[in-house]
Amino acid sequence: MSGIPSKTDVVVIGAGVAGLAAARRLSIAGREVCVIDASDEVGGRIRTDQVDGLLLDRGFQLYNPSYSEGISVLDLKALDVKSFTPGVVVSIDGRNYKMADPKREPTWAIDSLLAPVGKISSKLKFARYAVGLAISKSKSASYDQRTDAFLRASFGTDLTDVLLRPFLAGVFLEPELATSKRFFDIALKSFISGTPGVPSAGMQAIPRQLAAQLPSGSIHLDVTAQAVARTMVRTDLGDIRCRSVVIATNARSAALLIPSLKVPPSNAVTTWYHLADCPGSELTEGKSTLVIDGKKFRGPLDDPSRPLVNTVVMTNSAPSYASNGRTLISSSATGVHSSTQAELGVRSHLAALYKVPTGNWTHVATYPIPDALPMMAPPHDIEQSVRLSDGVYIAGDYREVSSTNGALASGRRAAEALLTDDL
């Protein structure tokens, strides 16, 4: 894309939600901002493809309307977030058991209590911990550790391996639960505070709404940043002189621009989309509820018969994701898998999870995403410095926590630091 300016106040590199949040704050403060991105659309990792009347998010993603940053910068009514059921269905030995917050899904209360996912005392202990988190004002615990170690020590092996680990593997996108307990606490608190879902127009509606708040002509796509200095950004289309720079790319791209920058590794995911040959009302009681395999971590991690960490009927809550009343299923596995054999294994696992034949389901798309989520290993600093050097700032969920809220917060903090320094 041509037409980049030769001069501006601030260059923001990256048109994901972190970069857009930074640009929004700077524009409100009266700064002239130029946002550049190497991609052909805004959104970064939050992208939605429209294919034959279907909305296909690139990887299974949800948005929680309780996110504090989103409340401040997004029009949630316009996003029309379609909430999923606040719970999970756990598949164990040929049966499906419903687990949910009894206050929000009271009809599932008995099932939640009696499901063979651990001792009742362990479930009650976990519930008390979750309630305590919900009312806590603290941002993070002073001591950090691996989530897996904390869960086993606190709630026992059965509850951890049969319920918590299968669920959290799909949240963290890593099966070992080597992720920071600080991040676990933040994620759990958000699940309690609000019910995640998807915008009716797809997840990319979020960055598109942020982009629409910027002055016309602020965003320049198909532009690759090649080098950064305080007063200049070199791109493949020419140099842009500026007073300050905000680097809001993903971690890998940021490290290419700033070789001294330490960035975390990324967790990978593969998401498959299928159209079922039955109405959504025949699957998970017509609800959009995550289905997980309670036996997935009772055997080898690479068991080909149990590839998935979760699956959900998208259209039970968000019928706009498939035209003409079709039933769209989203299913995910950690790691990168793109072979035909992998899809056949997924289809077989889906039959076991939903308890229906899946041989006639239509495979729509596969999205292998190697850099799906920054790894949050302990000890993790949830508010890392946004100042890189004089006039150069950095933003991204890997600098905060791996979530849309973390990206929004990081972008805002980078912009506010710039404004403070540029008085």
Regions found by a protein language model. Give the residues of each.
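Conserved flavin/dinucleotide-binding core of flavoenzymes
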Residues: 2-3, 319-423
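Mid-domain catalytic core of redox enzymes
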Residues: 5, 226-343, 352-353
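N-terminal Rossmann-like FAD-binding beta1-loop-alpha1 element of flavoenzymes
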Residues: 5-35
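Conserved Rossmann-like nucleotide-cofactor binding loop
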Residues: 18, 41, 252
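Glycine-rich FAD pyrophosphate-binding loop
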Residues: 27-51
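N-terminal glycine-rich dinucleotide-binding loop that anchors FAD/FMN and/or NAD(P) in oxidoreductases
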Residues: 49-73
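Mobile amphipathic helical/loop "lid" adjacent to a hydrophobic cofactor/ligand pocket
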Residues: 67-71, 75-177, 190-193
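Helical element adjacent to the flavin cofactor pocket in flavoenzyme catalytic cores
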Residues: 186-236, 240-244
